[in-house]
Amino acid sequence: MNSNSFLISAALIFSLLSSNSPTSILAQINTPCSPSMLSSVTGCTSFLTGGGSFPTSDCCGALKSLTGTGMDCLCLIVTAGVPISIPINRTLAISLPRACGIPGVPVQCKASAAPLPTPGPASFGPTTSPTDSQTSDPEGSASFRPPTSPTTSQTPNDKDLSGSGNGGDPMGFAPPPPSSSPSSSHSLKLSYLLFAFAFTIIKFI
């Protein structure tokens, strides 16, 4: 372990043990990581802060032990959620299990996390049904009615009826007036008879 990682480890241990009661600190921050768990992963601080390219064997051994005894604490470590004052690189923390040959840890941490509630559909106010909109606006519904065509009267004209009743043509054509030639010839014959009768009377007188 080089001097840089030693100083970081010492700072981590000092921050955990600076209080008179480490248990009271854990109760206040409400974390599943106990002081012994955090002290066991002090060898990972160099890798988590970008001070080393690969995690040490002590770091990987501590991670493997946490997979069986403190999975919740391990999930906090790989997600950079440990409540300590050391600046942990989140990308390096997520890649730490794979670098130690434990690639399934991030998947197990996602499976153990509580699912977020599914958001419900957004409400934009009460929706009105088509029936309500039609009943509330009778004039608007009337505007969509088809225009009614005027009904044509099927009753024949009064003039046509009067013409057909007088013997005329039902289509309204009046019959031609009777010819006056028969009556004139009849009156002419009657005049001749009267003249002959008058002549006969005068002859006998």
UniProtKB/Swiss-Prot annotation:
InterPro entries per record: Bifun_inhib/LTP/seed_sf, Bifunc_inhib/LTP/seed_store, LTSS
Name of the protein this chain belongs to: Non-specific lipid transfer protein GPI-anchored 21
Disulfide bonds: 33-75, 44-59, 60-100, 73-109
Organism: Arabidopsis thaliana (Mouse-ear cress)
SUPFAM superfamilies: Bifunctional inhibitor/lipid-transfer protein/seed storage 2S albumin
Gene name as annotated: LTPG21
Lipid attachment residues per UniProt (GPI-anchor amidated serine): 179
Family the entry assigns: Belongs to the plant LTP family.
Primary location group: membrane
Propiece span(s): 180-205
Domain of life: Eukaryota
Subcellular location: Cell membrane
Keyword Iron-sulfur: no
A GO CC term assigned to this protein in UniProt: plasma membrane
Composition-biased stretches (Low complexity): 126-156
Function: Probable lipid transfer protein.
Keyword Zinc: no
Stretch list, region Disordered: 116-182
Gene3D superfamilies: Plant lipid-transfer and hydrophobic proteins (1.10.110.10)
